[in-house]
Amino acid sequence: MIQTVPDPAAHIKEALSVVSEDQSLFECAYGTPHLAKTEMTASSSSDYGQTSKMSPRVPQQDWLSQAPARVTIKMECNPSQVNGSRNSPDECSVNKGGKMVGSPDTVGMSYGSYMEEKHVPPPNMTTNERRVIVPADPTLWSTDHVRQWLEWAVKEYGLLDVDVLLFQNIDGKELCKMTKDDFQRLTPSYNADILLSHLHYLRETPLPHLTSDDVDKALQNSPRLMHARNTGGAAFIFPNTSVYPEATQRITTRPDLPYEPPRRSAWTGHSHLTPQSKAAQPSPSAVPKTEDQRPQLDPYQILGPTSSRLANPGSGQIQLWQFLLELLSDSSNSNCITWEGTNGEFKMTDPDEVARRWGERKSKPNMNYDKLSRALRYYYDKNIMTKVHGKRYAYKFDFHGIAQALQPHPPESSLYKYPSDLPYMGSYHAHPQKMNFVSPHPPALPVTSSSFFASPNPYWNSPTGGIYPNTRLPASHMPSHLGTYY
């Protein structure tokens, strides 16, 4: 059994008792007399200055008057006693009287990676914690474990008409052999379905190797704790709803699996602690924050090559957006302009300095940020950049729009090219004389020394049709042959 007890000075002290390997019991402060093997050492203080044995049973009037407690229960199982692949524990957080959300993680998850996923407990946490080692395999439960599981199920699922005394002679092996009809003989049908479904879930679902809370870090060098961690166990945290307001209830969630598992809910009994068994108050700073431990991507390494390539105009004058990319490609310019993440957003930390450098590049000494910002608005319609709303001096490049803007366009002269000059129109004009097309360049008119016009065609061969002077009939003209018949 592993217990952690704080002193009023808020220092964590170890209160560990040796539990033999064959004794896997779900112990409570009000447990049965055979559990009185454990002992606890309280920290020295004005109120708690002695080492005392825990009472095997606390009178009812004592624990009813105690403040609500937050109980941590750790289930431990020997790998040789676990069936199938159930060689690792599970951790869930449940609010009494509330709902608990959880799902298993992959088997073999390390403690460090799990601590990164845990939610930071409320800083004003004043609850007590207690860790108890119990078997993770339901077949290893004792009758006391079965009783505590039933008590937890009644509170967690709001079950009615469940008589725990009817299960007092049933241990884990007998419980796992019970059928639905056996459950219905002891409790109503609705309760039987809930209990049987959750029992099957505990038996069939592989449990990841996880631990529960910050006390592990304080006790991580303890050989007994390391033994309990290496042998496998399940840690369950149960904060009391009367301590936390509903808005700040602590719920631990896991990534969803490819299949939809049944309702994820760890179980345990609720313990009422004596004043001597107050647990350590975990410090919020003891839990590492996921945001601080995630590797931060360097935007200059990711966007640097792209910025350098786009900032080079090749031939011609550099544009303003290219000048900004040129500044952003070098991290030494972060005193005046810097990337804000890796999505193309940037911020001018010193806009006047950026405007001054742009004025030097363009030989405009009167350049200021007002003029520069007006020039940047021109790029909004071009889909080159946009203004980040709600942030001063913050803009965002649209690299997709820049890629479209840099695509080469055909020259405008080709749009007015004569069709005969286009390559695909060559065969169409190969034989214009067959299509009765007029040649675009008519031949020059023939000019003779005797006449402006060429020799007459047959239309002007009639003797009476000599309209123009100096016309003569061709020498090959034949006389009429009609005279031979008359």
Swiss-Prot record:
DNA-binding region: 318-398
Domain PNT: 120-206
One Pfam match: Ets
Modified residues (Phosphoserine): 55, 88, 103
Chief location bin: nucleus
Biased composition (Polar residues): 41-54, 271-284
Source organism, top-level taxon: Eukaryota
GO CC list: cytosol; nucleoplasm; nucleus; ribonucleoprotein complex
PROSITE patterns linked to this entry: ETS_DOMAIN_1 (PS00345), ETS_DOMAIN_2 (PS00346), ETS_DOMAIN_3 (PS50061), PNT (PS51433)
SUPFAM superfamilies noted in UniProt: SAM/Pointed domain, Winged helix' DNA-binding domain
GO MF assignments: chromatin binding; DNA-binding transcription activator activity, RNA polymerase II-specific; RNA polymerase II cis-regulatory region sequence-specific DNA binding
Cell compartments where the protein resides: Nucleus; Cytoplasm
Cross-link Glycyl lysine isopeptide (Lys-Gly) (interchain with G-Cter in SUMO2): where in chain: 289
Chain intervals for the UniProt region annotation (Disordered): 41-62, 79-99, 249-311
InterPro entries: Ets_dom, ETS_fam, Pointed_dom, SAM/pointed_sf, WH-like_DNA-bd_sf, WH_DNA-bd_sf
Alphabetized UniProt keyword annotations: Cytoplasm, DNA-binding, Isopeptide bond, Nucleus, Phosphoprotein, Transcription, Transcription regulation, Ubl conjugation
Functional description taken from the UniProt entry: Transcriptional regulator. May participate in transcriptional regulation through the recruitment of SETDB1 histone methyltransferase and subsequent modification of local chromatin structure.
Family as reported in the entry's similarity comment: Belongs to the ETS family.
Complex formation: Identified in a IGF2BP1-dependent mRNP granule complex containing untranslated mRNAs. Interacts with SETDB1.
Name of this chain's protein: Transcriptional regulator ERG
Taxonomic placement: Eukaryota, Metazoa, Chordata, Craniata, Vertebrata
